Amino acid sequence: MHVVVTGAAGFIGSHTCERLVAAGHRVTGIDAFDGYLYPAEVKRGNAAELARLPADRFQLITADICDREAMARAIGGDVDVVCHLAALAGVRPSLEEPLRYLRTNIEGTGVVLERMRALGLARLVFASSSSVYGVRPGVEAEVVAFREDDPCLAPASPYAATKRMNELQLSTYRDLFGIGVFALRFFTVYGPRQRPDMAINKFVAAIARGTPITLFGDGSSRRDYTFIDDIVSGVVAAIDRVAPGRYEIYNLGGTQTVSLQELVEIIERVVGKRAVIERRPLQPGDVPVTYANVDRARAALGYTPTTPPELGVARYWAWLCDTGRAP
């Protein structure tokens, strides 16, 4: 099978490309190497890892998903599945430049869809986000996990809004043009190669160095942290199963919710040092909890996460140490 992966040099994209090639697929990776959220050198490092893949099974093309001509050159008619991971991520940065997020995430996805429509391609796997659920007042996170059929009417950030708009955009293309879509709602992914702006990366580095970490709020906000290997298993299963004319949404999470304070304590145990904590008020755009019900993904994709946070953080720390990246 020939798979196009957009955002191929990113955190999730690079791992997905490696897994697909290992499974025997041919992969064309596309990435803009944008330095907006973090230095482009980080993606260059990921690309160096991808360069070790067999040249007859993997190629990496530099292209912006918003550039129609570039995407026309990058995506050919022999493609079986498009795995669209490219996007501007991050809740807080989206508050500063919402128009930039709209252009990349909405227009860029539209360019990908139009290229697929022009070629008659009909199988797409899309990276959505748990942020589409927004704030759910009155829901006890420890009891009620997020289900795919829960209302998603109040995204708390421009980033979240773009991801929900993407889901509607993709549904429309299924209805009008028969493009099959599996939209995967990722829940706080972490692990080797994670973005440097992510909380776990920042906390691990600061605690290891003995420098202060900043906690927004009282530490009670909760996240469903999901290790990269589990996420990629779900992505590859979706690529194998997506079919023309189908539109499905699946949660991909770790199935347990951990408070920010608990996360800090896990990192302290793994790194072997105590955190120096500076507290700040809650930030706009943050939601109090995310928590995935993955029953639908388990039934349809065979998705079964196997990495609890303590083990995942330990594996991430081991990777930092083994690759000389540990502070």
Each language-model region and where it sits:
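Hydrophobic alpha-helix immediately C-terminal to the catalytic Tyr-X-X-X-Lys motif of short-chain
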Residues: 165, 169-173, 203, 263, ...
